[in-house]
From Swiss-Prot:
It comes from Brassica napus. Belongs to the oleosin family. Residues 48-119 are annotated as: Hydrophobic. The keyword Transmembrane helix applies. It is a multi-pass membrane protein. It is found in: Lipid droplet; Membrane. This is Major oleosin NAP-II. It comes from the Eukaryota. GO terms for biological process: post-embryonic development; reproductive structure development. GO terms for cellular component: membrane; monolayer-surrounded lipid storage body.
Length: 175
């Protein structure tokens, strides 16, 4: 496998101007690395100062929020304890009212949707799912007719409506 791959990178020679162009890139990179070290160090210091400033200000803001929350809870807790016999049932009642209104609205929308579908089906339009309903109606109608025929056959067999040869034991009439 090693024989398949060239060992040196200069197998494909470049045209003279391309070789000069690419050789300049390497030299520019070396010059950038010599001068870029100071630049990257000052950039790292600027990043660190910015991060410390942003982090510190966010830490102060979160501390103020925590202190404000603790003070608000300290003030509100006695009020909540005093008014809890009134507030808890009131909140439960409000929750039940909201649940009732939302559910009745949902049921109303569902009813309007169903009535709209029935209207479209009754007027001859073909709403979505009507083909399944027609198929189920045809299957059910076929089963009803089959049961009706069987009931009529067994009713005639019990009342003696068939020929004498069919009434004997062991013979069955099939349709």
């Amino acid at each position: 496998r090693r024989d398949q791959y060239p060992r040196d990178r200069d197998q494909y020679s470049m045209i003279g101007r391309d070789r000069d162009k690419y050789s300049m890139i390497g030299r520019d990179r070396d010059q950038y690395n010599m001068y870029g070290r100071d630049y990257s160090k000052s950039r790292q210091i600027a990043k660190a100062v910015t991060a410390v400033t942003a982090g510190g200000s966010l830490l102060v803001l979160s501390s103020l929020t925590l202190v404000g929350t603790v003070i608000a809870l300290t003030v509100a807790t006695p009020l909540l304890v005093i008014f809890s016999p009134i507030l808890v049932p009131a909140l439960i009642t409000v929750a039940l009212l909201i649940t009732g209104f939302l559910s009745s609205g949902g049921f109303g929308i569902a009813a309007i949707t169903v009535f709209s579908w029935i209207y479209k089906y009754a007027t001859g339009e073909h709403p979505q799912g009507s083909d399944k309903l027609d198929s189920a109606r045809m299957k059910l109608g076929g089963k009803v007719q089959d049961m009706k025929d069987r009931a009529q056959y067994y009713g005639q067999q019990q009342t003696g409506g068939e020929d004498d040869r069919d009434r004997t034991r062991g013979t069955q009439h099939t349709t």
